[in-house]
UniProtKB/Swiss-Prot annotation:
It comes from the Eukaryota. GO terms for molecular function: peptidyl-prolyl cis-trans isomerase activity. This is FK506-binding protein 1B. The keyword Isomerase applies.
């Protein structure tokens, strides 16, 4: 299991390092294998709310994000297919993500701070 990153637009900027602050635009869906794109119900999005700014690679985020975003370059747009063990696992995220749910995220690494 783990995370599979599919790049749609290659980045040309620097790659983040663990502990660095990243600026990301994202949308997250519950994975639904019956859909052609795998995207089921949307559970979160930064679009319209403002960029997501956080440290990467320090355990603040789900493991799938930490591992995949550290392999991205600024300007890259990718889809992350994250198995539940690299997401929220058995506990899920109350009210948003059920236990053992696989996740899909569209992620745009906009910058580093």
């Amino acid at each position: 299991m783990g995370v599979n990153k599919i790049t749609h637009v290659a980045g040309t900027g620097p790659q983040p390092e663990a502990g660095q602050t990243v600026v990301i635009e994202y949308t997250g869906w519950l994975k639904d294998s019956s859909q052609a794109d795998g995207k089921g119900a949307e559970f979160d999005s930064s679009i319209g709310r403002g960029d997501f700014v956080t440290q990467i690679g320090v355990g603040r985020l789900i493991r799938g994000w930490d591992e995949a975003v550290l392999k991205m370059k600024v300007g890259e747009k990718a889809t992350l297919d994250i198995s539940s063990d690299y997401g929220y696992g058995e506990r899920g995220f109350h009210g948003h993500i059920p236990p053992n749910a696989d996740l899909i995220f569209d992620v745009y690494l906009k910058g580093l701070q």
